[in-house]
Amino acid sequence: ESVVIPDPKRITLCISTQVGCPLDCQFCATGLMGYKRNLSSAEIMDQFLMVSRDYGKNKISNIVYMGMGEPLLNYANTLKTLQIFAEEKTKDISLRRITVSTAGIAPKIIELADSGLKVKLALSLHSMFEETRNKIMPINKKYSLKENLEAVRYYAKQTDTPITFEYVMLKDINDRTDDLNELLKLCKSLP
């Protein structure tokens, strides 16, 4: 699955890295279909090539690894495609216009930081409280919010790239004043 997000100033391509998703985030429809398999690097690149054919190669200005699946659970193939985009002959899209979105796989965030590929990173945050995050994002039980925040701070320092936080507001779950205050504290603590 890939999705084109048109905007008057840019065209963003949202690409998938897995068929389904194993994370079972409680607010995400993809989790309902279960996990089938990782996409190969060729299948990931094919999404870009097919949309480029339809829109024109130079029309796609941004890529987000934010479709179906968790990119950092398919790290080898995600990394391989990022390396392809980094090659001189595919420099149509700058790495600074590529964002990898993750639910929070802390060791892989650090690996990506050390890869030398300075792509943008987005953390699907959705709560600043471990207990709430455990309920709505079961992956938090394996890689805690604390671990992930340390990893994204490391990423920002290593890559000199700002971090994006994604936050779906869920009524009576993560929409309280305390949630907002903690989120503001986090944002103020980062460069």
Tell where the protein language model's regions lie, with residue ranges.
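N-terminal [4Fe-4S]-dependent radical SAM core
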Residues: 1-17, 44-58
